UniProtKB/Swiss-Prot annotation:
Lineage, opening ranks: Bacteria, Bacillati, Bacillota, Bacilli, Bacillales
Gene: dabB
Role according to the record: Part of an energy-coupled inorganic carbon pump.
Species of the source: Bacillus subtilis (strain 168)
Domain of life: Bacteria
Family: Belongs to the inorganic carbon transporter (TC 9.A.2) DabB family.
Record keyword Glycoprotein present: no
The keyword Transmembrane is assigned to this record: yes
Transmembrane domains' residue ranges: 9-29, 37-57, 68-88, 105-123, 162-182, 204-224, 231-251, 259-279, 303-323, 355-375, 382-402, 410-430, 446-466
Any one cellular-component term (Gene Ontology): plasma membrane
Protein keywords: Cell membrane, Membrane, Transmembrane, Transmembrane helix, Transport
Any one biological process term the GO annotation gives: electron transport coupled proton transport
Annotated NCBIfam families: PRK08601.1
Classification via InterPro entries: ND/Mrp_TM (IPR001750), NU5C-like (IPR003945), Proton_antipo_N (IPR001516), Transporter_DabB (IPR046396)
One protein family per Pfam: Proton_antipo_N
Name used for this protein in its record: Probable inorganic carbon transporter subunit DabB
């Protein structure tokens, strides 16, 4: 009773602090409020973040507090979104100083991250849909922040249309669930008793609606266009977009994981995500624009996350989306220093290097096979083993095989071993923390898993062949096709920002 009362009090305090940050953002809109108030606003933003950290520390006991659902996943994602939002807003204080939409930016940003945090705390399906819709509206307005620029307005229009389709898909899925189960409470909807009353066609229909609702924000093929167009948004907006919002699909699928049992919807999700991995990787390789490279990377990474969800590895998907969010936010915030020096590496001893390459190939194969044999009947383990072996091989080549002499190879081995150790520690801690909260669903048939494996192997083999035949016609066709996929539509491109003329005339 004491723990329940404590959590209830903390939740009340959290909402008070969240409202205070929202009021602070609205006050900052008034032109008479000095720009220096932004630092006070940043201080107020830290208050709900600190309270969410206290809730996270007390999330050992899960349960419902009114229409809100508190468990380790909800508390973790609330803290994560607010922490990323706080860091990016603090970064933006100087980065966007002088921008005509400076005040509006902080208000919209606070509104968007606040709505996202309340989405993951919602234990009522109606509140979840409402706050997720508010998050998508806030993101659309952030993309359209520079409304005087026709390109930004066009990008917001494209994003808004797709977001509307995604939101209606989620809305109809929740209405269907209520009609079938008679429950609005999330914890009651996903029980075995409630889901047992669903017919096979009803379950499949709801699954397909949820899949459509999550692949659009995740920018999966064929709905990746909005993320490509949104590159015109300010860099801090791109940072929160890629770090804390596009990965929402993994959280939604995790929440409704008991509904999925390896049927046709999971297979469709597997195929679309696998295709997106190949397309996203290709876009990131052919684009020369730094932000477009990151767009391609995000499409591919979200594809991997959804593959994990489709295979029932929801804890791995949550770990993936958190680490990806931290990594991608860092990459966007350091975009200003992305134009570095391109030094040609000199490899003094090619024979020695290729001996190390072969050693890395053998080591990667052994570790990948060993990882797979720990659970040979698990489809996720098979794909993970493939990705693990490939990642280790690439990292070995870059850090060890072509290291600068003995010292360089020792340093590379140290970095590689340290990174692996840190990853496994993080994976173990998150798994121990989340395994009681997250349901592990039935996996798709092994035939579907093998199709995904074949697609990934085909993509890897195609990339290797193309890299060695750059003068072929096929290379030119593939290259131009990937460039076209990664470029915005003509309406969303201007050779010069003509809207600036009105400010100098």
């Amino acid at each position: 009773m004491l723990v329940s009362l404590s959590l209830s009090s903390l939740l009340t305090l959290f909402f008070i602090m969240l409202m205070a940050s929202g009021i602070s953002g609205l006050l900052f809109l008034h032109p008479r409020v000095p720009l220096s108030f932004v630092r006070i606003h940043i201080g107020i933003l830290a208050l709900p973040l600190l309270v969410s950290l206290l809730i996270l520390a007390n999330s050992g006991v899960s349960g419902n507090v009114g229409p809100w659902h508190l468990d380790s996943l909800a508390c973790l994602m609330t803290f994560f979104v607010l922490a990323i939002g706080f860091i990016i807003q603090r970064f933006s204080v100087r980065y966007l100083m002088g921008d005509r939409s400076y005040r509006k930016y902080f208000t919209l940003f606070t509104f968007t991250t606040g709505a996202a945090s309340m989405t993951w705390l919602s234990g009522d399906l109606r509140l979840m849909v409402l706050f997720w819709g508010a998050t998508l509206v806030g993101l659309t307005l952030l993309i359209r922040l520079n409304s005087a620029w026709q390109v930004a307005s066009e990008a917001a229009k494209i994003s808004g249309r797709l977001f509307l389709l995604s939101w209606f898909s989620l809305f109809f899925a929740m209405m269907w669930l209520f009609h079938a189960t008679g429950q609005w409470q999330l914890s009651l909807v996903v029980t075995n008793e409630s889901l047992a009353g669903l017919g096979e066609w009803e379950r499949t229909g709801i699954q397909l609606l949820i899949v459509l609702a999550v692949i659009i924000p995740a920018a999966q093929w064929p709905f990746q266009r909005w993320l490509v167009e949104s590159i015109v948004a300010p860099t801090p907006v791109s940072a929160i977009m890629h770090a804390g919002l596009v990965n929402a699909g993994g959280i939604i699928l995790t929440r409704f994981s008991p509904l999925f049992h390896g049927g046709i919807a999971s297979i469709i999700l597997l195929l679309l995500a696998s295709i997106s991995v190949l397309i996203g990787t290709g876009i990131s390789l052919v684009q020369v624009d730094y932000k477009r490279q990151l767009v391609g990377s995000t499409i591919g990474q979200m594809g991997f996350m959804l593959i994990q969800c489709a295979l029932g590895a929801y804890i791995a998907a949550i770990i993936h989306l958190i680490l990806h969010g931290l990594f991608k936010a860092t990459l966007f915030l350091q975009a200003g220093s992305a134009v570095g020096r391109h030094e040609v590496s000199t490899r003094t001893n090619e024979r020695t290097s290729y001996l190390w390459v072969m050693a890395g190939r053998i080591l990667s194969l052994v570790i990948g096979v060993a990882f797979w044999l720990t659970a040979p009947g698990d489809g996720y383990h098979l794909i993970s083993a493939l990705i693990l072996g490939w990642s280790l091989s690439v990292s070995w080549d870059q850090l060890v095989a072509f290291g600068e002499g003995r010292i360089g190879r020792i340093a590379g081995l140290t970095v590689l071993g340290g990174a692996a150790l840190v990853y496994f520690i993080i994976h173990h801690l998150f798994y121990k923390w989340l395994h009681t909260t997250i349901f592990q669903s039935v996996q798709p048939p092994m035939s579907a898993v093998m199709i995904v494996v074949c697609l990934l192997l085909f993509g890897s083999a195609l990339g290797t062949w193309v890299a060695r035949h750059r003068s072929s016609v096929f290379f030119a066709v593939l290259y131009l096709w990937l460039v076209r996929l990664g470029e915005a539509k003509p309406k969303s491109v201007e050779s010069h920002p003509d809207y600036l003329k009105q400010y100098i005339s």
